[in-house]
Design a protein with these regions (language model features):
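Short Gly/Ser/Thr- and charged-rich N-terminal loops/segments
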Residues: 11-14
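Short terminal hydrophobic/aromatic SLiMs and anchors at protein ends
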Residues: 16-18
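Basic, nucleic-acid-interacting segments
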Residues: 20, 24-261
Length: 261
């Protein structure tokens, strides 16, 4: 990914052997790719409080924070109605079943950008399940991708890491993003090439922008991809060991990371 060629020092004969082996591997094995797409919903306020949603690339740090999204004891969350409505719109556009009952749960883990020590997310009862979309790669191949689920959750804060010599580096945290509404769209592992993954991600972005629920501006981090990549023998229905590639914020990164893996 960095552009460094780890095989440059090998003699031509060994390179030819490696290239032959790669071709044989491609004939015998296929890639299996599933994706998780995190999309910030376009609401005026956060998921569980009245704090405004601000552009974290320009806003003064830690100015859109309250006891709820700051994780102070005793603060009670109240769900954002518009975020729920937007999540339902996306579910319908993805041919999902909209569940009559949905619930939130605490996803417990420790990280400095998570002030409560848990993330409010949906686990057992997501708002939308069992959908699908059809996409087309550049070579005209149609690919039907299943949508396992789409669920709502809150975004984390944003960390800024500063390196310094002598171990004097430090990290600053901006909580303006903490609590911003997110919709996580989880696909089935139905893609078998980086081209198919690109077509799927592009289609999801188009749908979100058409519905007006997300700007699609990946430079601002409002749309982030995670690719789950494995390989298996061609014809096998058993999934291989999965590698999860997180926080891909561009189509180019998605394609290069998937191809590399």
């Amino acid at each position: 990914l960095s552009g460094h060629d780890p095989l440059a020092h090998l003699p031509a004969g060994e390179l030819a052997t490696i290239a032959w082996g790669i071709r044989m591997t491609n004939d015998r094995y296929e890639a299996v790719i599933g994706m998780e797409i995190h999309a910030e919903l376009r609401t005026a306020s956060k998921m569980f409080c009245a704090c405004p949603v601000v552009d974290t690339t320009v806003a003064e740090p830690n100015t859109a924070v309250c006891p709820v999204c700051g994780g102070l004891p005793g603060a009670m969350p109240v769900v954002n109605k518009l975020a729920v409505e937007q999540a339902m719109m996306v579910g319908l556009a993805l041919n999902c079943q909209i569940n009559a009952f949905t619930s939130f749960a605490r996803k417990n883990y420790f990280y400095p950008d998570l002030p409560k020590g848990y993330q409010i997310s949906q686990y057992d009862d997501p708002i939308a399940t069992n959908g699908w979309i059809e996409v087309q790669t550049d070579d005209g191949e149609p690919v039907r991708v299943g949508i396992r689920r789409a669920h709502m959750e809150e975004d984390t804060a944003k960390s800024f890491h500063h390196a310094a010599p002598g171990g004097r580096g430090y990290t600053l945290i901006d909580f303006n993003r903490s609590g911003v509404p997110l919709l996580e769209i989880v696909s089935e592992p139905d893609m078998h090439s980086a081209a198919a993954a690109l077509a799927y991600a592009t289609k999801i972005r188009e749908i979100l922008r058409y519905l007006g629920v997300n700007s699609g501006d990946m430079e601002r981090g409002v749309l982030r991809f995670e690719a789950n990549v494995s390989v298996r023998p061609r014809g096998s229905q058993t999934l291989g060991t999965r590698t999860e590639i997180k926080n891909l914020n561009s189509f180019r990164a998605l394609v290069r990371a998937s191809e590399y893996e």
